[in-house]
From Swiss-Prot:
Pathway: Amino-acid degradation; L-arginine degradation via AST pathway; L-glutamate and succinate from L-arginine: step 4/5
Active site: E244, C278
Protein name, per record: N-succinylglutamate 5-semialdehyde dehydrogenase
EC number: 1.2.1.71
Species of origin: Burkholderia multivorans (strain ATCC 17616 / 249)
One GO MF term attached to the UniProt entry: succinylglutamate-semialdehyde dehydrogenase activity
Taxonomy, superkingdom: Bacteria
């Protein structure tokens, strides 16, 4: 099998064999050989050779290829959505939205480059001040499994249109989606060496991250891995490092008139994508008293009816499987640890089959857990915290080293003003789910949730560096000389 894409051609990997599986059926979705360290080196050197011509190509020509990529994505939407659903378990309805987001990213990235970077000129008394932006060179892109098309695409598209060349290492849990995506780039006319694909597991990633010929590393994934990368590159200021990581995100419920609307947004926040969005709400803050009791009862009632099924089921389910049987078992174990620490299960999570990734949406009350662990449980496990007053809710919501997303559901505009001023997060929503984000806005967080704003509008900032020039078309001796100079 030819599973690697190096220097414009599909080639076989020379590393160990591995496979991805459909988490809803346990069928093999993709199999092949991983990239060895030598394969990774070939990919990086191919990108290095391609950089001079690609970066010298005019911006409009680079954008034309990206636009062709977007058009082909739309033409192949159903096939790509099926590939995403097969490897991740997410339902087709949601996988289709991922492909649409991939295509839309091209126009957003082009606009972002022109508005945030690009070229600007300002006249001076004796010349012109010019601000240009230059690509870094060869950048490594590490993709996650939860959005294996959309999230790495949010690094790759702005990197390419800025003039960088890319070596892409996708998640080992979704290699088939990466292969299909790179095939679209190839068919869009991307020159050889500009985008290279190295498949593999941990050793492949280490070989790529440790290579001395990369100029940047753009990562979307877990906070633990991102933190290790941050430590690794701490002594290398020449490497641009963009990290988008996880969050222990809070959603605060106020006393609202429309309880069903609040329950809907809470379910979307906690359980969309089977809870496998980095912006999903992990901690739900519910007021004590009669209103909180009514809200919680309705939340439990609707949650108990949520269906989970295979990605191509008819009718379509709200949730699919989580990424693997192992991930499902880890979620159940996380719930058990919380219960051991004093949490009360309201809807207990169970794994349907030990071979599969199906778990039900779960709700546990952690109000009485004395030292609630500041951990991201990446799945449909909602933790309820009952609060006495609004300031207590905000204080406990901010009691985290993360800072990705936060939300408030409240009718009171004054409560919102107070919330947005005091909450600590990069994405803060009012009467919208925590995982709702505008593609035209920066995406990312503070603290252990990462740096920069990858995968969205502000990606242009880390895909090119500013180069300032003072220019004059004519070389002339100044009319006024500095003291001590004689001509």
């Amino acid at each position: 099998m030819t599973e690697l894409f190096i220097d414009g051609a599909w080639v076989a990997g020379s590393g160990p064999a591995f496979a991805s599986r459909n988490p809803g059926t346990d069928d093999i979705a993709w199999q092949g050989a991983s990239a060895s360290a030598a394969d990774v080196d070939r990919a990086i050197m191919s990108a290095r050779r391609a950089f001079a011509d690609w970066s010298a190509l005019d911006f409009e020509s680079r954008c034309a290829i990206a636009k062709r990529f977007a058009a082909l994505l739309n033409e192949r939407k159903e096939a790509l959505a099926a590939a995403i659903g097969r490897e991740t378990g997410k339902p087709l309805w949601e996988a289709r939205t991922e492909v649409a987001a991939m295509a839309a990213k091209v126009g957003i990235s082009i606009q972002a480059y022109q508005e945030r970077t690009g070229e600007k000129r300002q006249d001076m008394a004796d010349g012109v001040a010019v601000l240009r932006h230059r690509p870094h060179g060869v950048v490594a892109v590490f993709g996650p499994y939860n959005f294996p098309g959309h999230l790495p695409n949010g690094h790759i598209v702005p990197a390419l249109i800025a003039g960088n060349t890319v070596v892409f290492k996708p998640s080992e849990l979704a290699p088939g989606v990466a292969q299909a995506t790179v095939e679209v780039w190839k068919d869009a006319g991307l020159p050889a060496g500009v985008l290279n694909l190295v498949q593999g597991e941990k050793d492949t990633g280490i070989a790529l991250a440790n290579h001395r010929q990369i100029d940047g590393l753009f990562f979307t994934g877990s906070s633990d891995t991102g933190t290790l990368l941050h430590k690794q590159f701490g002594g290398r200021p020449e490497i641009v490092l963009a990290l988008e990581m996880g969050g222990n995100n809070p959603l605060v419920i106020g006393e609202v008139e429309d309880i069903d609307a609040a329950v809907h947004h809470t379910i979307q926040s906690a359980f969309l994508s089977a809870g496998q969005r980095c912006t999903c709400a992990r901690r739900i803050f519910v007021p004590q008293g009669a209103f909180g009791d009514r809200f919680l009862a309705r939340f439990v009632d609707v949650t108990s009816k949520i269906t989970a099924d295979v990605f191509d089921a008819d009718p379509q389910p709200f949730m699919g499987a989580v990424i693997s049987a192992r991930a499902a078992a880890k979620l159940v174990d996380a719930q058990s640890r919380l219960i051991e620490q004093g949490a009360q299960p309201i809807i207990a999570m169970k794994q349907r089959d030990p071979r599969l990734g199906f778990v039900n949406a779960a709700i546990v009350d952690v109000t009485n857990v004395a030292n609630l662990p500041d951990e991201e449980h990446f799945g449909p496990l909602a933790q309820i915290v009952r609060y006495a007053d609004f300031d207590e809710a905000i204080a406990r919501a901010n009691d985290t080293a993360f800072g990705l997303s936060a939300g408030l559901l409240a009718d009171d505009a004054r409560a919102w003003e107070h919330f947005r001023r005091t909450i600590r997060a990069g994405i803060v929503n009012w009467n919208r789910p925590t995982n709702g984000a505008s593609s035209a806005a920066p995406f990312g967080g503070t603290g252990r949730s990462g740096n920069h704003r990858p995968s969205a509008y502000y990606a242009a900032d880390y895909c090119a560096y500013p180069m300032a020039s003072v220019e004059s078309a004519q070389l002339t001796l100044p009319a006024s000389l500095s003291p001590g100079l004689h001509f």
